[in-house]
Amino acid sequence: MPFSLLPRTIVHGLPDLTPKMLKKLGVELLMLDFDNTVVPYTTDVPTPAVRAWFRTMQASGIRLCVVSNSKKERVQQFCRQWDIPCFTHCRKPSRKGILRAAEAMKAPLQACALAGDQIYTDTLAANRAGVRSILVEPIHLHNVWLRLRHVAELPFIHLAKRRMKHEQSD
């Protein structure tokens, strides 16, 4: 797949991804980055809004899984708590972890999407794997490196928003 840093969709947070929206996009399997997408880096406890979103998504029939670069036990504990599959050591922006998750979940790539907070890892990996890339605003930019990375991503975010606006007007 092409090397692209432009997400196909941008949302404020996971609760903005509704089952209706995802079904309209043809998404059957939503892969989730973990840190700063589902929960902040500093905790494994989701906000009440994200907990409600998980319940809504699970009731909707859209399947969920976590694809994380992390190897930490806390990711696996979280996934056990919510009864969702977890794929760690994904090495995004490599596409291998995404392809491994899609194959394990028996989902065709065209029916998959990856929601994550980083363009240089999540968006790039999704685009390279041939799944829909969904950029979620980071939950918390708690240190200077995260803020600097986010600033470096802003040109791509602006380009993607312009493209999305143009596609909606067609």
For the regions a protein language model found, what residue spans apply to each?
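Asp-based, Mg2+/Mn2+-dependent phosphohydrolase catalytic module
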Residues: 2-32, 39, 43-44, 48-114, ...
